Amino acid sequence: LSVEDGGIGLSAYAMTALIIAMQVGMWFGYVMFGFVSDRVGRKRTYIFYVLMAAALILAYTSTRNPIALLVLGPFVAFFGTGSFSGFGAVTAEIYPTEIRATAQGFTYNIGRLASAAAPWVVGSLAETHGFASALSITSTAFILAAIFWIWIPETRGRELR
């Protein structure tokens, strides 16, 4: 979109470069989460990732500089989507074998159900308050996730039951 319409005013070429850079950051975020969480723990890694995502999204949505967007984009994707790598490991390690598959499916799909509303919510808010304000709500969701994870037990090194 043009700047006048609330967009960032990038050409199709520049937007493609931005998306590719973000996809690369995403991939590294997914991969690195496993290595980092094996070293320092699932809980600390997850909380760090989502708090970094919250901060970076606020920085990302407050700039219109194409170079800054290109530099910040991969880091937003690294932390914002890299945190999802933790769900499989943590849910496998928290639930006993007898209910593991059901519990993983339930928790995963509750998240999918909640996130199904995201395009509508972000679109509606963007229409009334602009894209930056709408996407900033994502920061709030990441902060709430960090708070919620305070009560999730650390599972690094835990034997499956």
Q: Where would I find each of the regions flagged by the language model?
A:
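Transmembrane-helix signature of 12-pass secondary carriers
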Residues: 1-161
